[in-house]
Swiss-Prot record:
PANTHER family the UniProt entry points to: COMPLEX III ASSEMBLY FACTOR LYRM7 (PTHR46749:SF1)
Superkingdom, natural source: Eukaryota
Name used for this protein in its record: Mitochondrial zinc maintenance protein 1, mitochondrial
A single Gene Ontology CC term: mitochondrion
């Protein structure tokens, strides 16, 4: 595969990742895409090889898809503490503190998986 094709594929993956991560936030979505476009036209670290720059863009796309979750404050909450709606999607990594500390642990990506609670702590 040519370098041009790899770069275009990485750019498309980045655009898809921004669409997923910033789904309901047009201002941030446009800013992220503008930053990605400017990074493609004028790379921030020209010392890196083209292959390394493409790999960096792929890594950023994976990070956006798996690790970035936006929250939006919910109005009209009956409690004193504010409530937030989180944009958790099918690609969001769900884990607990033990899996974060252990790099070999498998991370749950299924939203049907029950999240870890403090009361679930093994005794």
């Amino acid at each position: 595969m040519s370098t041009r094709t790899k770069a275009l594929n990485a750019y498309r993956h980045g655009l898809r990742a921004t669409r997923i991560a910033f789904r309901n936030d047009a201002e941030v979505l446009l800013a992220a895409r503008a930053k990605m476009r400017s990074g493609m036209l004028c790379p921030p670290d020209p010392k890196l090889t083209t292959e390394d720059q493409i790999q960096h863009l792929e890594d950023v796309a994976v990070f956006l898809r798996r690790n970035l979750v936006q929250g939006k404050k919910v109005d009209g909450s009956s409690t004193k503490e504010p409530r937030y709606h989180l944009n958790i999607h099918k690609d969001t990594e769900l884990g607990d503190n033990e899996t974060i500390a252990d790099p070999t642990a498998r991370v749950k990506t299924n939203l049907k998986a029950r999240p870890f609670k403090c009361s679930d702590k093994k005794q």
